Structure formats: C-alpha cells, structure tokens
Amino acid sequence: MAENMVWDPLRRKNVPLTPEERVRQWFITVLKDRMQVPLHMMMSEVGMKFGEGALKKEFRADIVVYDRRPGPMMIVECKRPDVELTKEVLEQALRYDMVLDVKYLPLTNGNRTIFCERLEDGNISFLK
C-alpha cells in the first residue's frame, strides 16, 4: 500500500490519506472498538441528494451508523484537525439529518468530539 493511502474497512478499498480521512478512520475505530459497533452496521461516504431540478445538490455523509431497525441511527461528521467544530459544522450534519432522520449526530475533528442528540421535539441536546 502506498504511504499516502489507507485501507477503509467500510468501503473495502484503499483511499487517499487526507487529514479528514485520518479522522474518519480514527472514528471508525472508536465506533468499532469502544462503542462495539460492528463494521457491517457502518457505511462511509454515504451519498444523498437535496432539492429538485436545478436546485438539486449532492452531498456525502462521512459515516452513517445503522441499528437493528430499518434505517440509520447516527451520522458522524468528520473534519480535519485544524477545523473548528462550529455551528456551521452542526448545520451541515443537520442537513444530512433532514434526509436520513437519525437520533445522534457526533461531530469530530480528531481533537474534539461533540455528541449531539436530536430530541423528539426537534431540538438538539449536547451530550457529555
């Protein structure tokens, strides 16, 4: 494997090792080893579309975690270590949530991780 590539166990292929990809692979390991999420219940780079016609835009969620019910339960938004976890990063994850309808929205840059929970009333709770 080339030095600038890394094996992605979710996509089952080598991918370029960018700073964001390093964070994504680290968080996949956290989910698998610390949170006991099986690899077969995760997907990375999940494509989705917003809007219609000329307004249609395509986006990709960094990591989506599924549970035993049909559908996803978590969207993980990964950023490079030098990117702050701002309101804009949360809003990006919330746009994905409009399509996937998940309960949990972790945001991470590898240095800091914020776990957000979407409540039934639509509000966001920041978990510790």
Regions found by a protein language model. Name each.
Residues 1-104, 110-128:
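A short, conserved, highly charged catalytic patch centered on acidic carboxylates
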